[in-house]
Amino acid sequence: LVICGKGGMIDELKAQVNAMGIGEKVYFAGYMAGKDVQRMYKAADISVFPSTYEPFGIVALEAMLSENPIVVSDIGGLNEIVQHKENGMKTYCGNPNSIADAILELLYDHKLCAEITKKAKNKVRNEYNWSKISQDTHFAYQKAICQSMAEKQKRELEQERAKKTKKAKNTEKEITNLLDF
């Protein structure tokens, strides 16, 4: 097992590994970048991201693009990106048995693993490329601008309607005063 990355939990993980007596089977690679990350994805059988909080998950997209099957927690952004047994495997957040089951299924079901890997790579290529991202960003700005303009026009119409209503009430009051005269 290779654990990549750094963070506040690394010392606790190392202590757990040592306490379990599996230190010789677990390698802590630390932070990796660039070509090292690509080599790691190519060497790995599966990439597992058991996050308890993940707003988006760039590393999972990198693994998918590298044709590395992924196992993710069913939370955050990855929950929206990954469809279970379509382009990855979802597990119950914080449930080690769920993670183990997903890993074993990928290791033993080569057909499923190949299908997931292919679909995952296609999803990343089609939905997370710079052209698509720029189009989506442009659309979001257009939508926000149009919404803002529509809200401004609505406010202006409401103000105009209020002025006309006030003027009509004043005119009605003047007519009533003239008739009372």
Where are these regions (language model features)?
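Aromatic "clamp/platform" in nucleotide-sugar-dependent glycosyltransferases that forms part
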Residues: T52
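A short, well-ordered alpha-helix in the C-terminal region of glycosyltransferases
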Residues: S98, E105, L112-N126, I133-F139
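Conserved acidic donor-binding segment of nucleotide-sugar-dependent glycosyltransferases
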Residues: H84-K85, M89-P96, E105-H110
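Short hydrophobic beta-strand element within catalytic cores of glycosyltransferases
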Residues: P69-V72, V82
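Nucleotide-activated donor-binding/catalytic signature segment of Leloir-type glycosyltransferases, i.e.
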Residues: E12-M32
